[in-house]
Amino acid sequence: MSISIRKKNFCIIAHIDHGKSTLADRFIQKAKIISDRDFKSQMLDSMEIERERGITIKSQVVTITYKSNDGDCYELNFVDTPGHVDFSYEVSRAISSCEGALLLIDASQGIQAQTVSNFYMAFEHDLEIIPVINKIDLPNANIDFVKKQIKNDLGLNEEIAISISAKNGIGIDDLLEAICKHVPSPRGSIKDPLRALIFDSHYDSYRGVVVHFRIFEGQIKTGDKIRLMHTNSEHLIEEIGVFKISLERKDRLEAGDVGYFIAGIKNISDVKIGDTVTLCDCPALSPLEGFKEVKPVVFSSVYPVDANQYDDLLKAMDRLKLNDASLTFEKDSSSALGHGFKCGFLGLLHLEVIQERIEREFDLNVILTSPSVRYKIIPKKGESYFIESPEQFHGNEAIEGVLEPYIRANIIVPTEFLGNIMSVCLLKRGVQTSLIYLDTKRVELIYKMPLSEILFDFYDKIKSVSRGYASFDYELLDYEYTDLVRLDILVNGDRVDALSQLVFKDSAKTKAIGICKKLKDEIARQQFKIAIQGAIGSNVIARETISPVRKDVTAKCYGGDITRKRKLLEKQKEGKKRMKMVGNVEIPQRAFLAVLKSNDN
């Protein structure tokens, strides 16, 4: 028994801010699954931060019903995916659950770096790709030029491209008809053993983990006992259903369906994205292909500004972890900042989102240390190991070498800004591997560069030197040898562990000078001299001095012997020496924030 041909599963993929969520809004309005009174823009972006930033952080699934012009009724399951490179694994899982993809392209901007990346991802999964030219209502929209890009850059048939304005609802009917016509129906049989792909999950305070899944073969119903094939854990299905903005309960789901199940799972880390679901009494012989553990690539420690709020921060981290399986954390402590957590993130945007959610949703002020990547240490004796923080790096031990992760950076830029972009990449230790002129006005650059070099201001810099026209995407490569050192910051000879950084040796001096200058501006003057130093091991490479507040001890001397004044000044000097020996310099929180949040460093 094969599946009804009236089911269609597709995802919406695009570069950042090309209109995915707005198009999803139009589909929802067209299907009338929510009243006009309850409708709001960015309907699927449930988090406040998503709405404010205009970005999608978590993939969202919706099932709608559409009656086509040929009179047939179609069940359309679509996934609105994130556009940022940090969440590309989430996009790949969404793509794995579909047969078709709508590739959105901004009519005013044309094909961008993430457009190309998502296209290849969909192409590798053998999806039917429908190019969609969005924002045709803009005064600078150039539909003919974008169609040429679709043909020349992507090798797609530009004649099937649908021109729409998701904002104004223009062309939505034509697009829905194209989906019904071109997206293949799901393949598979409900008689085969159950095989379903988990592509997302979220946590419900009352019912536990709600698992989002797509059934490829077989069927599932309430009361079935299931096994997750990679974790080998077994669970009893309490509820199944589909997504219609809210969860809509069903008695049974079968091959081709996209829906959810609830099985009393209390910890979201027990559910692995990409895992295969099967039945215990009639298991599948092999899992679906493509499963891999999602691993953090950026690391930073988070501390509460108020040390008394540590327990509150622990509760906040636990709550965030329930809805974000990709977030990792463990307890950490610093002599300067107190107790906190060492966290792993998918990228810088992921880090910013978590920080903002802690501050907004839990009303906590936090400090994050400088982001770092995972380095591989090759000792002269023993096995290699990984480190994520400066405290784990001991430069004096017998080390054969240090390796750092590299990326393949894909940059698309107008030809007039080519020189500017190449200069930025050179400063970031980039090695050019490819330069392709896409047409007379645009060029595609491929660079191999260290992941650590794009953590701070790389994206901002390429946007700045190209007046906002450059687009950037990257994928992780392997580890390569590097010349790494630990840069320590000392205040009056005491190391401030929270300000230590792992840096490339050639850029250590520049970074040290910048940090010392910033600390000099932020630390209040004392009655004794304060030395701020940047050091690699015992070698000081930068120094700033905060001069002491000086009392005029000779004010009471009116004329007379000069030796009297000298005695008073010598006495003051001796007193300041004693103060320096016993005096602790208090570094204000704003000084840490100034250094840690500064893109210049």
Curated annotation (Swiss-Prot):
Question: Record-annotated residues binding GTP?
Answer: D17, H18, G19, K20, S21, T22, N134, K135, I136, D137
Q: Which UniProt keywords apply?
A: Cell inner membrane, Cell membrane, GTP-binding, Hydrolase, Membrane, Nucleotide-binding, Protein biosynthesis
Intracellular or extracellular location(s)? Cell inner membrane
Q: Specify the tr-type G domain's residue ranges.
A: 5-187
Q: What is its main location?
A: membrane
Q: Which reaction does it catalyse?
A: GTP + H2O = GDP + phosphate + H(+)
Coiled coil spans: none
What terms describe the molecular function in GO for this protein? Answer: GTP binding; GTPase activity; ribosome binding; translation elongation factor activity
A cellular component annotation (GO) from this entry: plasma membrane
Q: Which GO terms describe its biological process?
A: positive regulation of translation
InterPro entries in the record: EF-4 (IPR006297), EFG_II (IPR041095), EFG_III/V (IPR035647), EFG_V-like (IPR000640), EFTu-like_2 (IPR004161), G_TR_CS (IPR031157), LepA_C_sf (IPR038363), LepA_CTD (IPR013842)
* EC number(s) given by UniProt: 3.6.5.n1
Q: Which family does it belong to?
A: Belongs to the TRAFAC class translation factor GTPase superfamily. Classic translation factor GTPase family. LepA subfamily.
Q: What does this protein do?
A: Required for accurate and efficient protein synthesis under certain stress conditions. May act as a fidelity factor of the translation reaction, by catalyzing a one-codon backward translocation of tRNAs on improperly translocated ribosomes. Back-translocation proceeds from a post-translocation (POST) complex to a pre-translocation (PRE) complex, thus giving elongation factor G a second chance to translocate the tRNAs correctly. Binds to ribosomes in a GTP-dependent manner.
User: What name does this protein carry?
Assistant: Elongation factor 4
Give the gene symbol. Answer: lepA
